Curated annotation (Swiss-Prot):
Keywords: Ribonucleoprotein, Ribosomal protein. The lineage of its organism: Eukaryota, Viridiplantae, Streptophyta, Embryophyta, Tracheophyta. Gene3D superfamilies: 1.20.5.110. This is Large ribosomal subunit protein eL13y. It comes from Brassica napus. GO terms for biological process: translation. Belongs to the eukaryotic ribosomal protein eL13 family.
Length: 206
């Protein structure tokens, strides 16, 4: 290297031009995807284009557990509470996940309500036009039925109203950080302290 020139930092192979990724098919690919979506919508009519109904779940881990999103499927417990047989659920556009567990009553109740709302709005077409079975929708409902495009029953994230309060001297006197640190320490030493207390009790009995 000589003179006051820029030091090159391009780490290319000898024939790097042969491996350049091009995107000339992007507009055609966009059209193909659009046509495929339209064909699928026609094929699955009158079912919604967005696919089966999914539950509202909380994300995993400390980072995401405050956020709600759509899950894989409803639990057997939720279906039972909503009065929907597990074998019927997939046939009427409700996804099922036998592995998911309900860990809170609030989550269970919200998903049961979601199922009930869906069931109330549901229009069920008979398998054969001439043989109408119990549970199928009326001819009038069938005539007015339309295919739902895009998202249906979207998750509405409610903004919690915040109440402004004036800081009191009592509030200022409490150090929240110190309190959390103390409780963490207590939790960490709980086992050792319990063992020490048990050993001391044994010594006293001797």
């Amino acid at each position: 290297m000589k003179h006051n020139n820029v030091i090159p930092n391009g780490h290319f192979k000898k024939h790097w031009q042969n491996y350049v990724k091009t995107w000339f098919n992007q507009p055609a690919r966009k059209t193909r995807r659009r046509v495929a979506r339209q064909k699928k919508a026609v094929k699955i009519f009158p079912r919604p284009t967005a696919g089966p109904l999914r539950p509202v779940v909380h994300g995993q881990t400390l980072k995401y557990n405050m956020k709600v999103r759509t899950g894989k499927g409803f639990t057997l417990e939720e279906l039972k509470a909503a009065g929907i047989p597990k074998k019927l659920a997939p046939t009427i556009g409700i996804s099922l996940d036998h592995r998911r567990k309900n860990r809170s009553l609030e989550g269970l109740q919200s998903n049961v309500q979601r199922l009930k709302t869906y069931k109330a709005k549901l229009v069920i077409f008979p398998r054969r036009a001439r043989k109408v079975k119990a549970g199928d929708s009326t001819a009038e409902e069938l005539a007015n039925a339309t295919q739902v495009q895009g998202d249906y029953m979207p998750i509405v994230r409610e903004k919690q109203a915040m109440e402004l309060v004036k800081l009191t001297s009592e509030m200022k006197s409490v150090n929240a950080y110190d309190k959390i640190r103390l409780e963490r320490t207590n939790k960490r030493h709980a086992g050792a302290r319990a063992k020490r207390a048990a050993d001391a009790e044994k010594e006293e009995k001797k």
